[in-house]
Curated annotation (Swiss-Prot):
Swiss-Prot/TrEMBL cofactor(s): Mg(2+)
Originating organism: Invertebrate iridescent virus 3
Alphabetized UniProt keyword annotations: Endonuclease, Host nucleus, Hydrolase, Magnesium, Metal-binding, Nuclease
Pfam families: XPG_I, XPG_N
Keyword Isomerase attached: no
UniProt: Mg(2+) 2 binding residues: 212, 214, 281
Role summary: Probable endonuclease.
Annotated InterPro entries: 5-3_exonuclease_C_sf (IPR036279), PIN-like_dom_sf (IPR029060), XPG-I_dom (IPR006086), XPG/Rad2 (IPR006084), XPG_DNA_repair_N (IPR006085)
Binding site for Mg(2+) 1: 32, 73, 191, 193
Region of interest (I-domain), ranges: 156-301
Region (N-domain): 1-101
UniProt name for this protein: Probable RAD2-like endonuclease 076L
Entry keyword Iron-sulfur: no
Sections of the chain in a coiled coil: none
Length: 380
């Protein structure tokens, strides 16, 4: 997701910064929800235990007096259709391959026949292992003596974990939990990250939380066209994106857009063109022009129009419009300070988690943190 290979590219320039989470106290953040929803559901694809992950995240944020607003995904623009179809095809190929591995394993258990696919799967499992054989053995001896049925079954289970889709049921359950915990959320009509960026330009939030590098490509387009509403000055502070939290170390990883632009010696508009040349969810990159070449081209020629290549595949005129947000107040009023829990919060939360996830949480602890964030309590 996001700009193709941009994260790895930016890591080389050391533009990511780790800060103490205490620096985020009393701030409002908007969260690109699909990122967390996919990550947490993937841990528990066959149950609703993922709800506990959100309870932990929200409680940890509120412990540090950080006030989140979750932004849910809406309908993607038509330019994203090709990417979505490609992802579906890729997912189906993975499912088909897992089915084949499972079938070959059954064949092996019945007849002892090791197919090339089963052999390849086992060799890849072995190569990932930190333990290596001290003595090199011939390939046929390794297969005969060391094929591990249990390890292959674990690999099949691991692959099956990602055979899920985020459904309306997941989204509705999470919204119900957020209401219960007094945390705001926004149902976007379009891309969640676009509305996150719009909220920041509208001075509604202090930080954006997203692993999606798309958020760095957006620029501000001013007031809504065709209206008499005067254009207000957008947020001119440095856009900072939180790409991850480390609960154990009480830290956050942040990337500053201004630092990126300064380091790469680019303007916001040239950086946008650089991102488009890398390839995005809305366009392909030019054949054999990856992130390094894209950077060189834009550094030399500043804009895509000047690049001496056939750039038609980039569809850059349309994609530039997608990466342009307008000043808007349609969601700003939904960004609020988190609310105190109700008097019967403990009972209601316990009932909710037990009903939907079949487990329990330390509701008393959650209640204490939500009512007094300054309490120095570690959530477990």
């Amino acid at each position: 997701m996001g700009i193709k290979n941009l994260t790895q590219f930016l890591k080389k320039y050391k533009v990511y910064e780790t800060i103490d989470v205490a620096e985020l106290k009393y701030s409002k953040i908007c969260i690109d929800t699909p990122m967390f929803l996919y990550k947490f559901v993937s841990q528990y694809p066959n149950s609703n235990e993922w709800l506990g992950c959100f309870v932990t995240l929200i409680t940890w944020l509120r412990k540090w007096n950080i006030h989140p607003t979750f932004v849910f995904e809406g309908k993607a623009p038509p330019e994203k259709n090709q990417t979505q179809e490609a992802r579906k095809e890729s997912r189906q190929k993975i499912v088909s391959k897992t089915d084949a591995i499972e079938q070959d394993l059954r064949t092996y258990l019945k007849s002892g026949t090791i197919t090339p696919l089963l052999l390849d799967t086992w060799q890849k499992i072995r190569s990932k292992s930190t333990k290596s054989l001290l003595v090199k053995r011939p390939l046929n001896l390794i297969v005969k003596n060391f094929i591990n049925v249990d390890e292959i079954r674990l690999e099949i289970d691991r692959r099956r974990k990602y055979e899920f889709s985020i459904t309306f049921a997941h989204v509705n359950l999470l919204k119900e939990l957020l209401d219960l915990m007094g945390v705001g959320y926004i149902q976007s009509k379009g891309e969640a990250e676009a509305d996150c960026v719009s909220l920041w330009y509208n001075n509604a939030v202090d930080y954006i939380v997203s692993e999606d590098t798309d958020v760095l490509a957006y620029t501000f387009a001013g007031g809504a066209p065709g209206t008499s509403t005067p254009k207000k000055v957008p947020n001119t502070t440095d856009l900072k994106v939180i790409t991850g939290f480390n609960v154990g170390e009480s830290s956050a990883t942040i990337i500053s857009k201004q630092r990126v632009l300064s380091t790469l010696k680019m303007t916001a508009e040239s950086f946008k063109d650089f991102c488009i040349m890398c390839g995005t969810d809305y366009n392909k990159n030019i054949f054999r022009v990856g992130v390094e070449k894209a950077y060189k081209y834009i550094s030399d020629y500043k804009v895509i129009e000047n690049v001496p290549l056939d750039t038609s595949v980039l569809d850059h005129h349309n994609v530039r419009k997608i990466f342009r947000v307008k000043k808007s107040i349609k969601y700003a009023d939904k960004v609020q300070w988190s609310k105190y829990p109700s008097d019967n919060f403990v009972e209601v939360l316990n009932t909710f988690i037990w009903t939907h996830a079949g487990g329990t949480v330390d509701s008393d602890h959650v209640f204490r943190v939500l009512t007094d964030p300054a309490l120095d309590i570690v959530f477990e």
